[in-house]
Regions:
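Extracellular/periplasmic carbohydrate-active domains that bind, remodel
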Residues: 16-318
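Bacterial N-terminal signal peptides that target proteins for export
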Residues: 1-11
Length: 318
């Protein structure tokens, strides 16, 4: 016979279990940054000790099997329990776009290579992003997050996209330039962003390698980048984070190292940049879109970085 006491105990268990689960989520460790201006602490994400190996979700190394779905399954599983590490083991892993979720640390073991495809259709459907300071819907960045918090890419692995198609797109033929003019016109006349569909026809607007859109508490730590279709790391309207110990080499057209656009409270340190364009850029949008969004960059410290090659060491508004 079920008593009232038994029912009450069961109710407590139902209430208490999810509280315990979420209590084991991401912790935020404040990091004081010495700066010549008042600056809030940035926060270092400390992720729970839960690992989700992509191999357990069907991923196979070797550079032949497309692992996009397996990686997405691992990210979703990790997200649903409150976060942890999605682990990319040693080996070469062929993939399309990787979309992060809140409380995810994409961790690459030493010897791990994420080899992104260069087939444009793999990066559809289009996502909300920006192109040279103007918001639009374009091909998904190779690694993308939108409106997430507590996200990281860490480890000693390498991000190394295939580049054959993107190199052809470097040429910026007439159709591409006409598409850009159309985007400028749409942005300057306040056409709604969802109507600025650019991943069509021969527009050839290349995707970013990493684009984090309106995210909070970001950590990029320790990995290497070898080549990029467009801007390499784009922190867009993000709040708070640490970028450290990166080794970035991308010598193609528009290959900025890191662009902080309309972002605040960031520490960039101990990174190495070898770029085909600017190394570090701080900017706040372009023309009408910039006024519409009205979000300045502020509280950014860049220190102890090496620039081997680049159009500028530090560009402001470039």
């Amino acid at each position: 016979m079920t008593t009232l006491k038994d029912l009450f105990a069961g109710l407590l268990l139902v209430i208490f279990f999810p509280i315990c689960s979420w209590a084991e989520g991401v912790k935020l460790q404040p990091v004081e940054v010495e700066a010549p201006f008042p600056m809030d602490s940035v926060f270092l994400c400390i992720f729970p000790q839960r690992d989700f190996l992509i191999t357990k979700y069907g991923a196979k190394a070797g550079g032949k099997k497309l692992n996009t779905k397996a990686i997405a399954k691992a990210i979703t599983a990790c997200h649903l329990v409150g976060g942890g590490r999605v682990v990319i083991p040693k080996g070469e892993w062929l993939t399309g776009p990787i979309h992060l979720k809140s409380n995810i640390n994409l961790y690459m073991e030493e010897g791990a290579v994420l080899r992104f495809t260069d087939t444009p259709s793999d990066y559809l459907p289009a996502v909300m992003t920006s192109w040279e300071g103007m918001e639009c819907y374009n091909y998904s960045p190779l690694i993308y997050a939108s409106d997430c918090e507590n996200i990281a890419i860490t480890g000693k692995g390498v991000l190394a996209p295939k580049m054959d198609t993107w190199r052809i797109w470097f040429a910026r033929p007439q159709a591409h330039m006409e598409a850009l003019r159309k985007l400028y016109t749409m942005a300057s006349t306040d056409v709604p962003v969802e109507e600025r569909q650019m991943a069509v026809g021969e527009n050839n607007l290349r995707p970013h390698l990493i684009h984090l859109n309106r995210c909070r508490n970001v950590l990029l730590d320790g990995f290497k980048i070898r080549e990029s279709p467009f801007w390499t790391i784009h922190l867009y309207m993000c709040k708070g984070g640490i970028v450290r110990g990166l080794d970035v080499k991308a010598n193609g057209h528009n290959n900025d190292g890191i662009d902080l656009e309309m972002s605040r409270n960031f520490l960039i340190e101990n990174c190495k940049f070898d770029q085909g364009d600017d190394a570090v850029v701080i900017k706040s949008g372009r023309n009408r879109d910039a006024w519409r969004l009205g979000t300045p960059c502020e509280n950014i410290v860049v220190r102890n970085c090496q620039v081997m090659e680049g159009h500028t060491l530090l560009g402001i508004g470039s």
